[in-house]
Amino acid sequence: MSLVYLSLAIAALWINLTGLGLAARRWVGDYAVARAAGIIGICLIGFFIEHFVPFGPKPPVLPLTTLGSLWLMWRNRATLRANLPGEALFLLGFAYCMTWRYAFPNIDFSEDKMPNYGFIVTYMRGGRLPPPDLWLANFPANCYYSFQHYGAALMGRVLCIGPGLSYHLAFCCLVGLFTMLAGRCVTLLCPWRPGLWIIAASLLVGGNGVVVAAHFLIHNPYPTDEVRFLGGAIVHDNLTALGHAVSGWMAKPGHEALDLPMEPFSFFLTKGDFHPPLAGFVLLALAAALIAAQETGADGRERRANSLILAATLPVAFISNAWIVPFQLLLVGGWFASAFLRGDRSWVAPALLGGVVATALEYPFLIDFTQQAIGDNAAIRLTAAGDHTPILGWLLTFWPVVGILLLALLERERRTLALYLVVVWAVALATSEFLYNHDIYGGPWVRFNSTLKWWQWIYAGVVLTLGSLNLGSRSRVARYGTLLMLLPCLSFAYDLGRQYIGMRKEDMGQLSGAAWIQKDIVIANMIMDLSSRPDGVTIESGLVMANTESPAVTLFSGKQSLLGWPWLEATWRGGFIDVNQRLAQMNQFYSNALPDPLGWLLHNNVRYVLWLPRDNVDHNSRFLPLNDQIKARYFWHHCYGNDRDFSIGYWERIDRLPSK
């Protein structure tokens, strides 16, 4: 990808985001909060309207919004100058994230990158919402909390860029927004200037408590070893003598080690998975900044606006990252309750208005989403006695935040705020240990998703709120004690740096995300050819009940799959029988074992049938018999090979012209 093109896209994005934030300052006093509220607000409004009237794939608004933003920037240049530190924090987070995305841009089948990319692709079509499910033909994409993906797609549509670049720029934008909001929270709570950079570093490159001990327990640990320490460390191949001893203390006789990941924000952003926890972190930082503003002198109109936005974060969390709703409610609802007990009633009407308006804007989505089977896979349950975190492992992971919690009890200047936050985070930590979300996983992974989604959010919340409060405290014990909690964890920056330097960067700068599969020039040309053809249901081989390379060719061609990853669709749709039936029938089709392949293709409205290198088994013995059975209605597009013992290409359905 041309650096000129990338630079123009980033410049257009920054100008429009700055203009949007300045426009929002008419109602919201704080610069950082105004930008976040403006972004969320415009996305919510679009999300609502497009359920009735679609904007199209490329709404022609970029010239107008850019000119309007430049005018607002000139008119409010004094405001921009006054808020340069906040702007610098946004650009710091954006640029740091871009160093990872630019070096490692592939959107492959690791983690959930491909399905997250698929949501962006389907929203970029610009049709009436809900859009079609790209991984389950004939069904709408209304079974997942995908507001973050809608926002990324809306950005890409306005900027007239592709889904791959939209994926990466939206990722960097959310990291920049998180950094900006976190910086605002620190600035309000901590007058000690170094505190800002310590908290920012702790969030962007700092690790959890394990990183300090990991180098004594594991030979040459990598970041993955440290974030997957609970469970992984017990069975690690490269344990030191001390590591073997600790492993023995943590192991439970007769129990397989539980896999309890604790991926801090610093690690999460390096993976490149545009997953809903990103939005969860932004909502955390937004709530923290709003609470800090309310506690440090916001009054009148600004206080009412802050209360409105704070309440609105709850319904927004439900459609962005439903996993953190209970904890967002604890944080936000806890502050409202605290204010009420102190005799502050000014928040009541604005908070009700904010919650009602945000919910109303989400209503068209919610009436479908709340009826989907994904909710049947979730139930909060008590953690069984044998499924608790080993005490030693828990302490090795959480000792920094436990220390920060205890040190916050020494805070005297803002004692009410400190006690409220201590209670909130202590309850959150206890809840994450004694309760879990019972989903599709079991055995050693019974708490996997719960700890993966909850711990990282709680850890970041403690560091951001109480860490800032402690570093700004007049108590030297609280201030320097918190430094002792945070500084050792910054050693994670070394491990991240070692990983960044050591990993191959052969696809650097290919921000379409498809470089990994387009290394094969034939596949690259097939994707280019398919992308230019009309929409239609597409099938390709290689699906199993796990993450697979399939259906990457279909996805990067912008086409809809008859079936994507079957395990994921089954999860979203509650074990929908049709998913397993489609998987079995597709495997039969590619094995040339389907009784009537032509009838099956026509019945499922399949327009494109891909034949890829992996289909050329047994000297391509299945190709000619299959071609003979479907050629009456499907035209073969030859891409490579001799169409006998080796073939790469695809069939396209021949649609007969209507009779005159």
Where are these regions (language model features)?
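Perimembrane helix-loop-helix junctions
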Residues: 74-78, 188, 291-305, 327-355, ...
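Membrane-interface alpha helices of multi-pass inner-membrane proteins
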Residues: 268-271, 307-321, 357-360
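Membrane-embedded, hydrophobic transmembrane alpha-helices
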Residues: 1-81, 359-366, 373-404, 408-411, ...
